[in-house]
Amino acid sequence: MYLYSLTLQQATGIVCAINGNFSGGKTQEIAVARGKILDLLRPDENGKIQTIHSVEVFGAIRSLAQFRLTGAQKDYIVVGSDSGRIVILEYNKEKNVFDKVHQETFGKSGCRRIVPGQYVAVDPKGRAVMIGACEKQKLVYVLNRDTTARLTISSPLEAHKSHTICYSLCGVDCGFDNPIFAAIELDYSEADQDPTGQAASEAQKHLTFYELDLGLNHVSRKWSNPVDNGANMLVTVPGGADGPSGVLVCAENFVIYMNQGHPDVRAVIPRRTDLPAERGVLVVSAAVHKQKTMFFFLIQTEYGDVFKVTLDHNGDHVSELKVKYFDTIPVASSICVLKLGFLFSASEFGNHGLYQFQAIGEEPDVESSSSNLMETEEGFQPVFFQPRRLKNLVRIDQVESLMPLMDMKVLNIFEEETPQIFSLCGRGPRSSLRILRPGLAITEMAVSQLPGQPSAVWTVKKNVSDEFDAYIVVSFTNATLVLSIGEQVEEVNDSGFLDTTPSLAVSLIGDDSLMQVHPNGIRHIREDGRINEWRTPGKRSIVKVGYNRLQVVIALSGGELIYFEADMTGQLMEVEKHEMSGDVACLDIAPVPEGRKRSRFLAVGSYDNTVRILSLDPDDCLQILSVQSVSSAPESLLFLEVQASIGGDDGADHPANLFLNSGLQNGVLFRTVVDMVTGQLSDSRSRFLGLKPPKLFSISVRGRSAMLCLSSRPWLGYIHRGHFHLTPLSYETLEFAAPFSSDQCAEGVVSVAGDALRIFMIDRLGETFNETVVPLRYTPRKFVLHPKRKLLVIIESDQGAFTAEEREAARKECFEAGGVGENGNGNADQMENGADDEDKEDPLSDEQYGYPKAESEKWVSCIRVLDPKTATTTCLLELQDNEAAYSVCTVNFHDKEYGTLLAVGTVKGMQFWPKKNLVAGFIHIYRFVEDGKSLELLHKTQVEGVPLALCQFQGRLLAGIGPVLRLYDLGKKRLLRKCENKLFPNTIISIQTYRDRIYVGDIQESFHYCKYRRDENQLYIFADDCVPRWLTASHHVDFDTMAGADKFGNVYFVRLPQDLSEEIEEDPTGGKIKWEQGKLNGAPNKVDEIVQFHVGDVVTCLQKASMIPGGSESIMYGTVMGSIGALHAFTSRDDVDFFSHLEMHMRQEYPPLCGRDHMAYRSAYFPVKDVIDGDLCEQFPTLPMDLQRKIADELDRTPAEILKKLEDARNKII
């Protein structure tokens, strides 16, 4: 079995982010690392975040830093990764790629303790970079320029110190003196030698300055000073002419200014009034904003509070350090302050935010200062504050993030054409159920009812130079309605259009004339109001029409074509007639090329299943140039001019290709390339769009031509980042559409469906899925589907939080203390997770501020029944008494009295530290009442461990409780034990069943295949895995095969050999006698590993599903970082050979950007086996054209054929 691995949605979580001028000029961009992906983002003029470039590096990005050489105009990016190499990247604006400027090897690959890459720090003047490991090793590279002004890099200079842990690293701004780097370090050499543990408890962190002597080319430890043992982060303080130099040390509860030869200046970080005394305050991210006359720091704590830190200094001497409350935003892994007045927050969990500065915190607020620091017997006097609504910042955009994706199921609850992906995401108050649909999201601008069922709609401008459309023209079966576009859309009668007949086409002709084609003729309306009519000869009528701005072709009944052109005066002149062999099914004329008077090509679709290209040149007018046979009669034709598939912003610098798109009556879109010179057709591709014949329309998206295909659902064909995408729109079925442009909606679409006129616009391009968000209360853990009622049951739990009632009581208390009424200036009983907007009236929205923190051993949990069709919670049971839900399943017991029941595994008083401990475990049994919309507790059964896995099995309940697999039956007051097996190695975390087989996943020992013998009432293991895997997800594939994922980012399949499987099924004891003997301290039989692949991210859920109507199934997976991928089985040996060779050539010709070897990356823990990396193969279109041809020649193909194979492989999955 060979599989094709493809990422459907890239990771959405962000590990780290930096900002700078990477493209040169004044524009500021943000470079973000999403695990194995490097993205370049830029806020547009509307304050929306746009992705400029995205690249898969096939390695783990651990750290990023930017630097600029003195006098240069753009920034470079230094990447610390798991490749054992330092890589310096430069963004190439013309080609829209990252160019690798330097790559220097210094150590082994992989994320290791002593191999640098975890920390990267640069000298603020761009003269040197230090790359550090968690322990021991630090290397310094000197950066310079050669005679041609290109960046050069020196050999590495070592700054190693053994037995030393590094916590943070940063450059020190010392102007143009020798570069200095600062590190927080801890020497553990004594602690290592002392068995009593006293030296470990006395170990002291130090702040160490490393100086690079540019004259001697040598690094030395210049200064080391003890620092607070809670120190975790360093921030560079501007130096030279801009400030006092030195560093800010962020420690638990404190911010300390430190510099060589300067006394420490310390201020406490203000803490929330409701924070338990046992909890400290740690800084998790920081940013500095520097202007010519001043600078300040923004630091964010682990609770999301942002503080403004300022230094009062005179020259190099700092007299006071102030920490003032600024605002509260969700906790971020990185924050970036842009010069345009934006703050980008890369959230740890949930959506990322772009904020605009309203003010910079000059108004009085809660402030702590080094000058009023008070020391008491318990320590320093804390300063308290109460979070408030945003005052200095306002959120203007957010980027969706699924991180962390906790559970995922592919279901078609809404009975749509394609299934939906239901995913549990987020953490705490930012948790959500997200319903993902393949396709682009749209924003509906207006819907209005029409007096009847319209058949078509067009928009027209009055003049070619107009920016916006003037009229919407709607055709009915016996009339035409004209609406003018202004402040209001209203009907007009003086437009010159004939309104007593249906219309076949409405368009602008020439520079300022309008044309209406109706069954009996052509109406030409001049700018001055004069109207010219052309009537059809005899009793024949016009059936089809094709047109552009200067040319019109009509097809009369019987198959006669008549060709018109607009002359110099704007008058329509008949040029040529041509008799076709039969009726014409559809027509289209190619757009007029820039600077030309006419287009050369006319496409004609006939009912004999052919499409012909005819010439419109005066020399050979209406002569057939080429013929294409298609699988069904064409319904609609569209010429689309698109740019080449590589290049700068959307390939703008490359010559256009002309594509002919045909919508066929069997629901297929047929796409073929038209030779711009000869009109010959080549490189055809087809894709099934839906059950209705696709109608094709040309619209404008981001200023470029795009194609709207209306089948049983709408599709959009468009260019994004140099590639052509054909993606469904998440909208209802439409009948007819036209581009729409007004001052309120510059790039919209007007469409008709049923008796309604709809205007909408397309949101973000390039997305695979769009999402509907349903907020949840606590961190979701797992969910199940009620099979008959189509309701979802979700279990949620959080550690160290208060229940909803306790939070409500505390909130009221807080309002009363603040002198506000019970509802504050909003509503205290506002929806449970504070809605999605900071603008809501609630001054303490949980979504923004997080939940108040409780003691770490306190748990809150709830069971939610949710109707996904209405997104409403029909039942919410909050668990009491410190219980947390861990597992859930639906179960039908032999006793049919209650029907489908719900089993929930919970644990009371769970503690992980200092050692794992719990009071008791329970299995709750609930019955569904009120049509499944509510739950009623039948009983709960106490068990001795944590029930992490539950599963129905032959009318009973299987439970994994610690290392015990137990079978329960339903009793009146509790569950009744029927049978158990205690021989599992550690902890059971998953159970799946098929017939009489049970597939058990152990937390650290992979899969165990079990059987239940009903006659002996015994559970026994007949096969297990010989590789100890730390399971995070599992799925049953077939009778002998299981798919699993481990916590190191691998996906693997194991299969019981066919002969063993048959032997066990035929054996009257079912392998039981062999089991009693055992083998290698385990089961008598071992499963074979048949598939192995390193995804590079921890997979949390696996499922077998098909995303395409009637398509074959794939294994879908979701990861912690929020990416969604699929593994699809090849059906032919030819495909395996082709993609294997393509992958081999891509490895050779396109080495990963950050220096990791692709083969080694995909085999990071176990050698890759029988999986082809589709993500690498899909980099093929980004290669230069000569390289594409070289690879294609070696594969005996053309580049177009390879692109077609890649497109087909993706279309089989989604």
UniProtKB/Swiss-Prot annotation:
Gene3D superfamilies: 1.10.150.910, YVTN repeat-like/Quinoprotein amine dehydrogenase (2.130.10.10). It comes from Arabidopsis thaliana. Residues 817-848 are annotated as: Disordered. It holds the Pfam family CPSF_A. It comes from the Eukaryota. Belongs to the RSE1 family. GO terms for cellular component: nucleus. One of its GO terms (biological process) is pollen development. This is Spliceosome-associated protein 130 A. Subunit of the splicing factor SF3B required for 'A' complex assembly formed by the stable binding of U2 snRNP to the branchpoint sequence (BPS) in pre-mRNA. Sequence independent binding of SF3A/SF3B complex upstream of the branch site is essential, it may anchor U2 snRNP to the pre-mRNA. May also be involved in the assembly of the 'E' complex. Also belongs to the minor U12-dependent spliceosome, which is involved in the splicing of rare class of nuclear pre-mRNA intron.
